[in-house]
Amino acid sequence: MASVISVLHGQVMQQDDEPPLAKRRRCREITFAGKSFYLDVPANRQTQLLTKAIGRLGGIIESFLSRDVDYVVTGSKKAVASVSSVATRRGEKSQIQAAERKEPIHCSRGKQLLKKVVHSQECNSVLTNARSWGVTVLYVEDVVSYIERLERPPSRGIQNKTAEGRAADSTRPSLKIARLRSPFIKIEDQSRKFRPLQCTFTSFPELSFVCSDKSPFETVQTVKKKDPGDQEEEEGQRSQKPQARKRKGYCECCEETFDTLSEHLVGEHHFRFVSNPLSYKMIDDLAAQLTCDLMELPFGSPTSPEAERSSQNEDWDLDLAPGEAEPAGNEGHELGILKATRLDKDGHADCEDQGAPAYLRDGGAEEPDQRCGEIPLANIEVDVYNVCSFDQPVVTCTMELPDVSAEGKIHSNLLGSTVGDERVLQRTNGTCEPHIDLALGNGRELKHAELQKDPLTKDSQPELLSTAHEQLPTSAPCMLLEGASVVHFPSHGGTVGSQGDVTSHSAANKPHTENCPVDSTGDRHAQPAGSDALAMSCVIPTLDNGGRHVDATMQSHWEVPLGCTTDTLLSYSTTVTVGELGPEAHNPTPEQQPLLISTCSSITTVCCTDTEFKSCTVSVHSTSHSPPNQNVKSNQTPSLLEMDLANPNCHRAKRKHWDSLLSPPGKKPTSPSHCQSLTLPMWLLCQFPNYGQQVQLPVWADLCKWDGTAAAEEGTVDCSSSSTLPKLHQDSFSSESDWDAHLPSFFQNNPQQSLQCGDLRTAQVTLNESWYGKQLCNILTHDP
C-alpha cells in the first residue's frame, strides 16, 4: 500500500516542510490530474465505483492498452506479485528489463519449448505487454483503499507535536484488542507500565514421565506417518548425519544414572529404597518441626461456610456424667452446658494463659510444668444458666480437661465407666464463687482453674476466687463432685428410667479424706480401668461425720440421631441420690434425722472417634428435703441443711416452679432437657429407711416460721432461703386453691416481705401456663 501511495503522488510526498493537513488537501486536488488508467478487471459494481472515483480525482480512464497509459489496474494478485520492481519513470524501463533478466540455464530444446508453452498460458497478454512496455501494474484492492483514504474527512484529533510551539496535527493510533482463547498464559504488570505477556496453546502442557531426555513439562509430540518414498530419502540423509548422543538421567535417591525413567522407577533397587521407612526419616523430621495451622474437623461437623460460622460458638463438648444433683443451698435447678474450645497451634494449653492457680504456675503439686508440656489440654468453657430465670447467668467459669485420646484409642462406641476421681466444688466466705479441683483416675492431676460466679443480686459485683487454699475448710459449706459409673444398654424404646439396670455407688464413690471433709468408713475410691472415656459425675451434698448416701443411676437406652453413624450416640439417664444427714445416719428414723433426696435427668450426646472423645450432657436437677428434727441436741454437729439456711451469703436463684417428687397440677409434659418433675420408682422407694412409715410433711407456714428463727433477732427473714424449700405432696392431684392455702398467713407474719414475694409466688405457681397464674401475679404485686 505504501508503494502505491508513493507511485501515485511521489513528487507531492517529498515535500516535508508543509503541514500534514495542507499536504492532504493538496494531494486531493492534484492526485490523478493528467494520469491515465487502464482497468483490467471484470465489469461489476466495484469497477463502476472505481471509475467514478478516478474521474472525481482528475484521472482519465483509457479504453485500450497502449504505451501512453500510466497505470494498469488488474484483479489478479499473482500477476502483481510476480513483478519484481515498479518503475517510477519511463526513462528507467531499460534498467528494469535488465534487472528482470536471469542467467540462462542450460537445458535441452524440448524443455525450453515446454516452458514457453506453460508461460504463455499462465501470463495474460495485457500484463505481458504492460511489463514489456514498463507500465506500472496495480492491484485493484490497493487502489480502492487508497481512494477511500483520500476521500475520508480529516480527523479532529489534532495535537501539538513539539513543545517549542509549532502546531502539528496527528491522529491517535488505533488500539488493537485481541481476545485470548483458552488455553493460554497471561502475565500482567501490576504497575501497568509494561504490556502484558501472553502465550496461547492448542493444548495445555502436561507432565510427562515417559521421556527421559526432555523436560517433564514439554508435551510429547506424536510422530506423523510419511510416505514410503519420503522415508527412504530421509533414511539416506540420516545415515550421512551424525546421531546425537542420548542423555541419561540421574536418581538422587539411588545415586545412580538411568536410561529410562519409567524402567528405573519399577526397578528393584529403587523399590527397595522406597519401601524402607528410614530412607525418608530426615524429611519426616523436618516436616515435624513445621507448625500447621490447620485442624481436623470432628466427626459429623458441618462443612458449609454458614454452618462453620454457626459452629464456631458451640463446638463438640465434653460431657458431665449422666445425673447431676446439687443441694438446695446452691441453686438446685440449673442447666449445665460444657462448651469445648480448641487447642492451640501446638496442641497444648499454656498454664500461664489459661488462668491456672498460683501453686501450679509456681511449680508445685507433682511436677505440673512437665505434664503441661506432655499432656494435651483442652480449654473447656462452662456456662451454667438458670432453667427458669432468663435475665442473667448464674455461673460462668473456665476449666482445663485433658484429651483422653493421648493414652490410646477408644475401643467402644458406647460410654464406659468413668476415669474420674473426686472433684471438689467449694464456696469461699463472703461470695458464691466455687473452685473446681479435677483429677483423673490414672493419677494425672489436672490443672486448677479459677471459677467466677455472678451473684443473683444486682448490687453485688463478682469477685475472683483466691487459689491460695489447698485444703477445704471444714466450717464452710461445700459440695462434693464424685465419680459415677454409667450403665449403658444398646436397646431402643422406652422412657427415661424405664429400662436399664441400677448401679449402686455407695462404695465406689467414696472420696479421699485428704481432699474433702468427709469421714467415711467405707472402701476408698477404686481405680477404674478399661475405657478411656471421660465423664463427670453428679453433684451431691457433703455428708457429716458418720453420714452415708446411696447414689443410683438409671439409663434407659441409646439412640442414633438422624444423619449420623453409630459413632454418635444419644443417651437418656436419670440419677437419684438419697443422703442421710447427721452423726446417727446409720440407724435412721423419721423422728431423728432429715432425709435428702436429689434427682437428676440428663441427655448425653457421645461422639467416639479414633482420635478423641467428645460428648455433651444437658442435666436438670431437683432436690428436696424432709422436715428437720425439732429435738436435735445442742451438742450435735449441725447438718448441712441447717448450715445452708444459716449462711447469709448464699444467694439463690428465682424459680418458676419447684420440681417435687410429684408433678404440680396443670403441668405440660416436656423433654428431659427442660425443667421437668420426676417421680421416684417403686424400687427406689422401697430402699428408703422410712418407707412404709407415716412421715410428717411440712407446710409453708411451718417452714417460714422455722426459717425465720435464724434471723428473728434482727427482725428480718431471708425470703430467698425460704423459697428454696419445696412443697412436698403425697397426693397425686391437687387444686389451684391448695397452692395458695398458706399465702395469707405468710403475709400476715411477714409484712416486710411484700415487695419480695416474687420468689414465693414463682415457687408455687406456674405463671405462664394458666390464666389463674397471671391474675394471681397481678394481685400479689400490689403493695398492702
Curated annotation (Swiss-Prot):
<protein>
    <recommendedName>
        <fullName>Protein DBF4 homolog B</fullName>
    </recommendedName>
</protein>
<feature type="region of interest" description="Disordered">
    <location>
        <begin position="299"/>
        <end position="332"/>
    </location>
</feature>
<dbReference type="Pfam" id="PF07535">
    <property type="entry name" value="zf-DBF"/>
</dbReference>
<feature type="region of interest" description="Disordered">
    <location>
        <begin position="348"/>
        <end position="368"/>
    </location>
</feature>
<dbReference type="GO" id="GO:0003676">
    <property type="term" value="F:nucleic acid binding"/>
</dbReference>
<comment type="subunit">
    <text>Forms a complex with cdc7.</text>
</comment>
<feature type="binding site">
    <location>
        <position position="264"/>
    </location>
    <ligand>
        <name>Zn(2+)</name>
    </ligand>
</feature>
<dbReference type="InterPro" id="IPR038545">
    <property type="entry name" value="Znf_DBF_sf"/>
</dbReference>
<feature type="region of interest" description="Disordered">
    <location>
        <begin position="495"/>
        <end position="529"/>
    </location>
</feature>
<feature type="region of interest" description="Disordered">
    <location>
        <begin position="222"/>
        <end position="243"/>
    </location>
</feature>
<keyword id="KW-0479">Metal-binding</keyword>
<keyword id="KW-0597">Phosphoprotein</keyword>
<keyword id="KW-0863">Zinc-finger</keyword>
<comment type="function">
    <text>Regulatory subunit for cdc7 which activates its kinase activity thereby playing a central role in DNA replication and cell proliferation. Specifically required during the initiation of DNA replication in egg and during early embryonic development. The complex cdc7-dbf4b phosphorylates mcm2 and mcm4 subunits and is required for cdc45 loading.</text>
</comment>
<keyword id="KW-0539">Nucleus</keyword>
<feature type="binding site">
    <location>
        <position position="254"/>
    </location>
    <ligand>
        <name>Zn(2+)</name>
    </ligand>
</feature>
<keyword id="KW-0217">Developmental protein</keyword>
<dbReference type="GO" id="GO:0010571">
    <property type="term" value="P:positive regulation of nuclear cell cycle DNA replication"/>
</dbReference>
<feature type="domain" description="BRCT">
    <location>
        <begin position="27"/>
        <end position="117"/>
    </location>
</feature>
<dbReference type="GO" id="GO:0043539">
    <property type="term" value="F:protein serine/threonine kinase activator activity"/>
</dbReference>
<feature type="compositionally biased region" description="Polar residues">
    <location>
        <begin position="498"/>
        <end position="507"/>
    </location>
</feature>
<feature type="binding site">
    <location>
        <position position="270"/>
    </location>
    <ligand>
        <name>Zn(2+)</name>
    </ligand>
</feature>
<feature type="binding site">
    <location>
        <position position="251"/>
    </location>
    <ligand>
        <name>Zn(2+)</name>
    </ligand>
</feature>
<dbReference type="InterPro" id="IPR006572">
    <property type="entry name" value="Znf_DBF"/>
</dbReference>
<feature type="zinc finger region" description="DBF4-type">
    <location>
        <begin position="244"/>
        <end position="293"/>
    </location>
</feature>
<keyword id="KW-0862">Zinc</keyword>
<keyword id="KW-0131">Cell cycle</keyword>
<dbReference type="GO" id="GO:0008270">
    <property type="term" value="F:zinc ion binding"/>
</dbReference>
<dbReference type="GO" id="GO:1901987">
    <property type="term" value="P:regulation of cell cycle phase transition"/>
</dbReference>
<dbReference type="InterPro" id="IPR051590">
    <property type="entry name" value="Replication_Regulatory_Kinase"/>
</dbReference>
<dbReference type="GO" id="GO:0031431">
    <property type="term" value="C:Dbf4-dependent protein kinase complex"/>
</dbReference>
